[in-house]
A protein has these predicted regions:
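Secreted/periplasmic carbohydrate-active enzymes, especially glycoside hydrolases
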Residues: 1-101, 131-133, 147-148, 164-170, ...
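Hydrophobic faces of well-ordered beta-strands that scaffold small-molecule active sites
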Residues: 44-46, 79-81, 101-103, 147, ...
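Aromatic- and acidic-residue-enriched carbohydrate-binding clefts of CAZyme catalytic domains
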Residues: 44-49, 57, 104-139, 270-281
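Flexible loop/turn segments at secondary-structure boundaries
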Residues: 50, 87-88, 155-159, 185-187, ...
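Aromatic- and acidic-residue-enriched segments that line the glycan-binding/catalytic groove
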Residues: 91-102, 114-127, 166, 257-272
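Active-site neighborhood of glycoside hydrolase catalytic domains
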Residues: 96, 120-210
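Short, acidic/turn-prone active-site loops that include or flank metal/cofactor-
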Residues: 105-110, 182-183, 196-198, 219
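Substrate-binding clefts and catalytic carboxylate motifs of secreted carbohydrate-active enzymes
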Residues: 147-149, 204-301
Length: 301
């Protein structure tokens, strides 16, 4: 990394200074493969929410470094910021420690999903889509760890995402742009499905595709899971255009809660654990490779 110093001056001298760390690398898609500095890479990725069991969705620098160190221990080389731009410090740390980043815009309308009434097709929401795509690129453009822009998550497809793709490309032609619902009929540079099975992956990868296959979510890490990872990676190593994916997800989203009057024991809780009304989606807060306190689940190995 290099330090870039920028100063502004008026007739009385320097008025303001700022410095950032920058790096130089090239990212492109060529021959159906994602290339970094001219060489194909295998994405051994994880999707990560910003989460701490004691502070909720507030994480410190120490928390971030701990997550990166665990990722390095587990041979994870890429992270998708699901499903929003992360704390700016996260990208600086990914630059320093060497993690590839898929930087995701804060666009999620999960409740609408893919039906005719989804917000991707509602032009009243186009400005909101464009604003969120624009802001993530403006903010994170100078981070070399960011190799792919993501337009959002599970929000259907339509003219609002087509416009977002065009906007991002006009702002930054040096990085690929991906969006999972657009893989068949929309605009996306990466073929980035969710939870494709082995046969679907092999069918696509063996068809001499123009776009690389990198699953944005796969190997759902809930409970006794991830037993099929070897079969996926046998295919990844067999077909050059199949270049990996992002495991859903990195860490359980749960909060530390005392389970004894003395506070000497605890459990990890979420959703309906706090009252009779369950606002969570059953057990879908705890899908991590690691537990909320960062201990490793068996399938982490």
């Amino acid at each position: 990394l290099y330090t870039l110093n920028v100063s502004s001056y008026d007739k009385n001298g320097r008025t303001e200074s700022a410095s950032i760390e920058i790096g130089f690398r090239d990212v492109c898609i060529q021959g159906g493969q994602l290339l970094v500095n001219g060489k194909p890479v295998l994405i051994k990725g994880a999707d990560r929410h910003e989460m701490n069991p004691y502070k909720g969705y507030v994480v410190t620098e120490a928390d971030m470094i701990q997550d990166i160190q665990i990722m390095k221990q587990l041979n994870i080389n890429a992270v998708r910021t699901s499903h929003y731009p992360n704390d700016p410090l996260w990208y600086t740390l990914c630059d320093r420690y060497g993690l590839y980043v898929v930087d995701e815009a804060n666009v999620e309308s999960h409740g609408m999903m893919y039906g005719p009434g989804n917000l991707a097709k509602n032009l009243d929401f186009q400005k909101a889509h464009l604003d969120r795509a624009r802001r993530v690129v403006q903010r994170d453009f100078n981070h070399p760890s960011v190799i792919i822009w993501s337009l959002g998550n599970e929000a259907g497809d339509g003219p609002n995402f087509a416009a977002s793709y065009d906007l991002v490309k006009s702002m930054d032609s040096s990085r690929p742009v991906q969006y999972e619902p657009a893989i068949w009929n929309g605009k996306t540079d990466i073929f980035c499905p969710m939870y494709y099975d082995y046969k679907d992956c092999e069918r696509y990868a063996s068809s001499n595709p123009e776009r690389p296959l990198i699953q944005c979510e796969y190997a759902h890490a809930m409970g006794n899971s991830m037993g099929g990872l070897k079969e996926y990676w046998d295919l990844i190593r067999k077909y050059p255009s199949y270049q990996g994916g992002f495991i859903w997800d990195f860490v359980d989203q749960a909060l530390y809660w005392p389970s004894s009057a003395e506070g000497t024991d605890h459990v990890f809780v979420y959703g309906g654990d706090f009252n009779d009304y369950d606002p969570s989606d059953n057990s879908f807060c705890c899908n991590g490779i690691i537990a909320a306190d960062r201990t490793l689940h068996p399938h982490a190995y």
